[in-house]
Amino acid sequence: MVLAKDLKSGMTFLNGEKLLRVMEASHHKPGKGNTIMRMKLKDVRSGSTFDDTYRPEDKFEQAVIETVTAQYLYSMDGIANFMNNETYEQYEIPVEQVKDELLYVLENTDVKIQFYGTEVIGIQLPTTVVLEVTETQPSIKGATVTGSGKPATMETGLVVNVPDFVEAGTKLEINTQTGEYLKRA
């Protein structure tokens, strides 16, 4: 069992039959009354995100999540296909369940597949990925790194705000947690 006050971002727990992942957690002390825990949660099975509050002493069962390294193969007919790097077993995950993560993944990229028991509940991305810009506005002569930036569409469909000097065909390193441009690759 884990107390609500001990739940941190990234942890997964059971609330009744719901398998929930903590996206953000903070203590809140109102002017009157007791401290409460405000959390942004994601229902792992449905993919829905919502806000909830708990008392710090509320108890939950912590979910044991196992991970397996697998390679992303392809997506077809609403199913993303992955292959275990050690056993060559293939896993099928509904695209709807991992659509946000797939914006950072090219075919043949290694990811970690997360399991709760035998149920696939999601994928964990590497911290950074290298993607190629396929479309962006033309560069402005004399633009500097300190400019406000412009939107660029990556080869996976991800849209990232990039500095003005970036052109189509440039490979960029992208942070998968924040979706931000880090540097040229």
Swiss-Prot record:
Q: Does the keyword Zinc-finger apply?
A: no
Q: Which GO terms describe its biological process?
A: peptide biosynthetic process
The name this protein goes by in its record = Elongation factor P
Which cell locations does it reside in? Cytoplasm
Recorded source organism is Lactococcus lactis subsp. lactis (strain IL1403)
Spell out the Pfam families in the cross-references: EFP (PF01132), EFP_N (PF08207), Elong-fact-P_C (PF09285)
Cited function: Involved in peptide bond synthesis. Stimulates efficient translation and peptide-bond synthesis on native or reconstituted 70S ribosomes in vitro. Probably functions indirectly by altering the affinity of the ribosome for aminoacyl-tRNA, thus increasing their reactivity as acceptors for peptidyl transferase.
Assigned GO CC terms:
cytoplasm
